[in-house]
Amino acid sequence: MTAPNILILGIGNLLWADEGFGVRCVELLNERYRFPDGVRLMDGGTQGIYLVQHVQQADCLIVFDAVDYGLAPGTLKIVRDDEVPRFMGAKRMSLHQTGFQDVLALAAFSGAYPRELLLIGVQPEELEDFGGSLREPVRAQLEPALRVALEFLAERGVVAAARDGDAERLAPAPLALGRYEAGRPAEELAYRHGDIRFIPQQPLEDD
């Protein structure tokens, strides 16, 4: 019997506080564990529709994400199979979620759709802090979220082995959690609402 292709996907935007939850989960799994052939970890970031081909190739899809369930900040909620698309479209707070809902729809339309879906989502606390990191209620759910994924895999005979060396990075080194937070500017120096280079400025008045 051929082993299933399993895709473990983290989606979100590291630059917008709790939006980075999904990517941080996959980052930690990659740092700590080695997985058997057929299991792939991917930082999906905000790629949206460009993830279709990866979803089509998966027999089993595990997604980590920050999702507005309308619950208390930091609440971890697990959704499976046919319910997943509904929650990926609930009270959308970022462009990538719209894109990923479309990813699932296109994969289903093509006939190449995962047999199993698992969404491990956390209710965010803050999304409007550009350059910010995870808030404490959300950060506290990283370990529980990893346990859910590892238990789900173990139930299917997929065992993660502890790494004994450095892993190949899924994202550029400066975005690793420790370096990212260490390089965060002080509050009085930072602009937390976006990249000022791309925000329209009021024209200067002539003297």
Swiss-Prot record:
One of its GO terms (molecular function) is aspartic-type endopeptidase activity. Ni(2+) binds at residues 19, 65, 96. GO terms for biological process: protein processing. Keywords: Aspartyl protease, Hydrolase, Metal-binding, Nickel, Protease. Not known. Could be involved in the processing of hydrogenase. Belongs to the peptidase A31 family. PANTHER family: HYDROGENASE 1 MATURATION PROTEASE (PTHR30302), HYDROGENASE 2 MATURATION PROTEASE (PTHR30302:SF1). This is Hydrogenase expression/formation protein HoxM.
